[in-house]
């Protein structure tokens, strides 16, 4: 894909769409395109994560330690947390068909945020809203569990 095509694609990825075209240009230029065969493992649960992947084409099966599975496809950002901090992969990602991904290394993402403070602000606000929503959902689940707890 040409750089402008990659930028247009990245604009369709929910988290990345907040960043703006110039910030996405940095990511598109520095991202690595990887072609993955059907059945090939992109990463394994427990692997060190030094960046994220955006699925351009194809589908992946994500399997977690507890046996849960999820199928994801184009415009999915895999490993979002790894863009911000050192972490390990929480699941294994295996291609279900020939697939293409863009690998965004953490150092590139951090450099982009340093260069585009407005993009960093928008991203911080979005992540704060998502964290707030997750906290409310956890509180709701806890309230339901507490209501059913034997006294």
Residue positions per predicted region:
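Cytosolic regulatory regions built on CNB/CRP/Popeye-like sensor folds
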Residues: 1-151
């Amino acid at each position: 894909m040409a750089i402008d095509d990659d930028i247009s694609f990245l604009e369709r990825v929910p988290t990345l769409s907040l960043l703006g075209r110039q910030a996405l240009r940095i990511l598109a230029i520095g991202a690595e395109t990887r072609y993955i065969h059907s059945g090939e493992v992109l990463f394994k649960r427990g692997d060190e994560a030094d960046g994220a992947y955006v699925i351009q084409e194809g589908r992946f099966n994500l399997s977690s330690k507890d046996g849960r599975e999820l199928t994801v496809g184009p415009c999915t950002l895999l490993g979002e947390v790894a863009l911000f901090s050192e972490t390990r992969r929480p699941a294994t990602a295996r291609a279900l068909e020939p697939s293409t991904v863009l690998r965004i290394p953490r150092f590139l993402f951090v450099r982009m945020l340093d260069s585009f403070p407005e993009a960093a602000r928008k991203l911080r606000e979005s992540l704060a809203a998502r964290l707030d929503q997750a906290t409310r959902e956890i509180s709701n689940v806890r309230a339901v569990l507490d209501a059913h707890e034997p006294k």
